[in-house]
């Protein structure tokens, strides 16, 4: 079996729960066809660089897949039929990266020190 990374962009007017349900449908489809999903990351509602089918935002998801090629082809066929999906891209990779993607790692910047609030206004008045 081969390793794939798959990104899906769903319409902005569906709820986050519906976007998660779409991910679960994809997981079930891959597992029915003899594959395995190693990681699912929901990136949330993000701005699109340009409008796609009159949408300015989309629900982004990343899936790390270990599956045979026919399973991936069937998943892509199902996504072409689904009206909630704006775009998707599947890339074959040498090995699966199970760590947080850079998109989510950038959000989790809890290691940054807290800035004092009194310094904020002092620079503007000077």
From Swiss-Prot:
GO terms for biological process: translation. Binds together with bS18 to 16S ribosomal RNA. This is Small ribosomal subunit protein bS6. Residues 105-120 have a biased composition (Basic and acidic residues). InterPro entries: Ribosomal_bS6, Ribosomal_bS6_sf, Ribosomal_S6_plastid/chlpt, Transl_elong_EF1B/ribsomal_bS6. Keywords: Ribonucleoprotein, Ribosomal protein, RNA-binding, rRNA-binding. GO terms for molecular function: small ribosomal subunit rRNA binding; structural constituent of ribosome. GO terms for cellular component: cytosolic small ribosomal subunit. Belongs to the bacterial ribosomal protein bS6 family. It comes from the Bacteria. Residues 104-126 are annotated as: Disordered. HAMAP family: Ribosomal_bS6.
């Amino acid at each position: 079996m081969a390793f794939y990374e798959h990104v899906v962009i769903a319409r902005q007017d569906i709820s986050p729960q519906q976007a998660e349900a779409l991910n679960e449908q994809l997981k079930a489809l891959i597992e029915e066809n003899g594959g395995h999903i190693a990681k699912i990351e929901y990136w949330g509602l993000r701005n699109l660089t340009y409008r796609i089918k009159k949408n300015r935002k989309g629900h982004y998801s990343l899936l790390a897949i270990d599956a045979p090629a026919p399973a991936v082809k069937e998943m892509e066929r199902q996504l072409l039929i689904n009206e909630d999906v704006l775009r998707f891209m599947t890339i074959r990779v040498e090995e699966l990266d199970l760590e947080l993607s850079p998109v989510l790692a950038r959000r989790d910047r809890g290691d940054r020190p807290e800035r004092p609030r009194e310094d904020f206004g002092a620079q503007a008045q000077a």
